């Protein structure tokens, strides 16, 4: 059997009329509130529809609320890996766009980033090379300036803390840069990272990376490597991301979550968070 989770942030209202409309269509055995200090949420148990039918229906009905159709008795501790994207997922910015501000190329870089994240540029590695080339000559000190402005997305710390408490390995897999990923690793106690290494010479960015570029395939491989190291199956992994280069990672995981995802990512993901913070992932589970 499957359950349906509906949720909105605490500052919003979960419309009773919406819950009633949804219940009329999916015909749950019961409706139960989910206790949370950060959201208004309900669980509709044992749906009369199968998961595919319920998901198709919810894409039509659930405007204004986050939703997910999940197996019953889903527990966080049954998973072993939590894989997170960095830019626009764990943190609220696209770091390469912010680096472009110092070189006066932010608009050009941001346009390429947006196209790449929407999947309009098939070769992610080439899109990164194009953006990096626009940063050539940028002072290394700009990295620290961007770091000082960097903010975690809402619910990030709660999600990571709960994952660690349940025994999960937390992986940061990003097409961003080790300079930032390593600092986030130290700040948040992340277990491992996979990221691109900026090439820096004489105190300036060269506009290149060192080593292979971390693209969508490399993110997927990072998840598979973490699972192999732990001796678990990829279906025991949760992956969270927003862009087209996250699709391989989300597809490999047992639970793929789109966080403020691009349209193609939301269509492919098992769940989407467009309103709640990252801690919304936790409310998909009946228990830790």
Task: For each feature predicted by the language model, list its residue ranges.
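Alpha-helical substrate-recognition element adjacent to the catalytic core
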Residues: 30-46, 69-77, 89-198, 217, ...
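Residue-level marker of motif borders
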Residues: 80-82, 114, 237
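Exposed alpha-helical structural elements
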Residues: 18-21, 52-57, 108-111, 123, ...
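C-terminal cap/substrate-recognition subdomain and adjoining C-terminal extension
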Residues: 52, 137-138, 145-288
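Asp-based phosphoryl-transfer active-site loop
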Residues: 79-95, 245, 250
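Non-catalytic pre-domain segments flanking phosphatase-related domains
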Residues: 1-84
